[in-house]
Amino acid sequence: KGLCVQSDTLLPTIFLSMIPDSFSEREKTELRTTLTECFQSKTTERTEELLDNMVVELPFASELVHLTSFQQILSSLNGRDMYYSIEKIVEQYYQADESKAILYPEEMHEILLKKIHDFAINQTTAEKNGAAELLLTEPIKNLCLRYRNQVPITVVQGAKGSGKTFLYCRLLEKKNWNIFCSEINKKFDSEDNGYFLPVLATQNSEEIKPLLSQCIDEFNRAIDFADASVAVYIDNAYKLSLEKDNDIDWMKFWEQIFVSSVNKNMTSLSELDEALQINKKKIVLLIDGLEEILQSVPSSKTQQKAIAVLCQGVLNTISAKYENIGLIIFLRSDMAQNAITVNYEQFKQTFSYAELKWSSNEALKLAVWMVDHAVKGFYEESVSIENASQEVIGKYLEKIWGLKLGKSNSNEAYASNWILAALSDFNGQLQARDIIRFLEFASISNGKKPPYYDRILMPSEVRNALPNCSRKKISEIKAEYENLKPIFEKLENLSSSKKKLPMNAEDGIMTAMEEKLMIQAGYLIRDGEKMYLPEIIRHALGFRYEKGARPRVLSLLLKH
């Protein structure tokens, strides 16, 4: 005890094996903490990080409970996750140290950093963010497969920045459902039909306006009786803003919005559907930008009802009665959760096929995609990045930021795990712009000679990117989530003595409603009376860990 742990200190690897599923994450974290504390009595965040890889949990294997011979052990281990876990650890100590390889000489370092930095800056807005196309492949395929023979009637949920606006723009560009789907899958019907009409759209983007105008023009051209205003989405936003706090018949309101958007002389969905049937045409109504108008959903029963009626009552009615009318509602996940107060989980599951939620694997693929677009010829495989295996992606990630944040046989953190934990929230949400922004800041040169030539981004550059990412993240949250802004300002203004993790619930730092909103958004998690913040916001808020808190936060972040 009391050993001074450094990156090259020879530490044992402790295997936790045969841990039953009944063990909670909390119990496992306490066990790890007890073991690591044997090696250092006084820890800092930096030295705690060096102990992250010392305790390794091996998956439970019932066939290894009763063993009679060495031969049986070898036979039982063959092909097991336990075997591969041990193999990976042993390999890093006995293979040649790849960090000595020269893939990127010193004279290339600054050039590569600038290319990545410039490309990342160019990828920051949703409308021109080609990165979203890579990551939305699966939900788009799901949508097209589910509605290959009919117009779609669905809710596309996703957090802010998950790609909703990007997908909305893609639909506008193609102008009708059949053409959109035929470009995803050539086997689908490519005959024009399912014409899009933007009933509501985001008001915060100049780039989307030409797409909206062109889509409305095509809608009016294709549907004989259509007379949609070129500003229909602005007119509808105004109507909604007038009624948003009034206790009205929301079924009637939405029906009138929909039919009057097509033609002001129409009075009902049934009249619209009949006219479409006669003309042998189908339409798809598009709704986006609700969060810009309905800004008080967590506290306003009226606004909750407006969304609930739209996403349940209206959507179900159209689905059951009107085969020529489609509806795609783009909705921020937190708004859906606050508005659908009964059976939200069932609602979420119903539309899970179209949810825009990216996994950590997809986020890592995005990093490879970004570098490949910035540095031509970086990715050399025949299989596309979106279809590449984890093993292939892992090989290229090592070329970007190394296996570890140091030598491959050091005690430093595994780079990919460290980055995922640094950028994720407690809901497992990792947005495209988080990875893009990380690469933007990590590619800012520190002006020093690179210590390694086997990777593009140096450990110091990776670490230095996090505080900048954290500050940007909090600025975005305060700008985009009106209900979270005062909570973040309260946390920012706490005295330094109170800025420690875990926070104690009984200290009353947050009200019950504030706690609920933060947990819902993924920026707080409660474990008994203890409350934790994720890394992505902790840094900019200036919170520090108390002893043993950091491993608990990491286990919660990486369990997704």
Residue ranges of each PLM-predicted region?
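Walker A/P-loop-proximal flanking segment of P-loop NTPase domains
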Residues: 58, 67-69, 76-186, 553-560
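Long, basic/Gly/Ser/Thr-rich N-terminal segments
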Residues: 2-103
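C-terminal leucine-rich, beta-strand-based interaction scaffolds used for sensing/assembly
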Residues: 2, 14-23, 50, 403-560
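P-loop NTPase nucleotide-binding core
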Residues: 132-134, 146-284, 289, 293-300
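Short linear interaction motifs
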Residues: 131-154, 265-268, 307-312, 348, ...
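Charge-rich, solvent-exposed alpha-helical interaction surfaces
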Residues: 30, 34, 38, 50, ...
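Alpha-helix termini
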Residues: 142-147, 176-185, 273-276, 315-322, ...
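The catalytic "switch" region of P-loop NTPases
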Residues: 18-24, 34, 38, 88-101, ...
